[in-house]
Amino acid sequence: MYGKYWDAFYQKTYAAGKALWDVPPEESVLKDYEVFGPAFKQVETVLDIGCGTGEQSKFLGGLYTKVIGVDAAPKAIEIARASDHPPNVQFQVGDLSDAAFMDGLRVQFGDMNIYMRGVLHQIRQPDRTKVANNLLHLIGDKGALYLIEVGKNIKDYFRSASRAFHELPEAVQETFISNLPPHGVDESEIATLFQKEGYQLSQHGPGFLNTNLLLKDGTPVKIPSVFGLIAKN
């Protein structure tokens, strides 16, 4: 369902340069690791959902025994597979809303941890409950799910953002805003989506996602976000 759109995105974006959210893993995964690290200890398999071209997956491969990077875009997975990556990291094309694909992962790998950065806010509202159930099915009894997502009203935030953001050229501002989703996710939606008997949202709160767009003083533009950590009680 989502593969066609994202494949077109990667075909276009990677001909012109990196997407705004492509930042070094040290500025993304490593910061998130402070939250999910202790919860990912029961199983050594990590599913990196929305892996894109695989930089996050490769970084996770240095922390865990087995990492599977999944993305709906065949072009992104093609780039990831062609890159230099460790033998404990593999890449697959797959759609979170595809129950058969998700069941296949469960059969192949059993309980797993899930790292998901900036994906849920791109899922259509009617599909989100189904996707949340698929994710809980994958973590099973021993795994955990960490997600960090673009916050609500994100475009309005940047249209009224700090003076530093508005000092950027107008064309850059508009390009940045046009790449953001119209609606984000908030903590209450995360709590509702993953409210299933036996599972607990143990940590949640506000955060930010780094981008590779720099302000005039050299600091990166940050996107307000929310995070959640879910596991079996």
Question: Positions of the model-derived regions?
Answer:
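Conserved helix-to-beta-strand junction in the class I
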Residues: 137-139
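Class I (Rossmann-like) S-adenosyl-L-methionine-dependent methyltransferase catalytic domain
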Residues: 1-107, 123-127, 134, 144-233
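A conserved beta-strand element that flanks and buttresses the S-adenosyl-L-methionine
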Residues: 115
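Hydrophobic adenine-recognition pocket in adenosine-nucleotide-binding enzymes
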Residues: 119
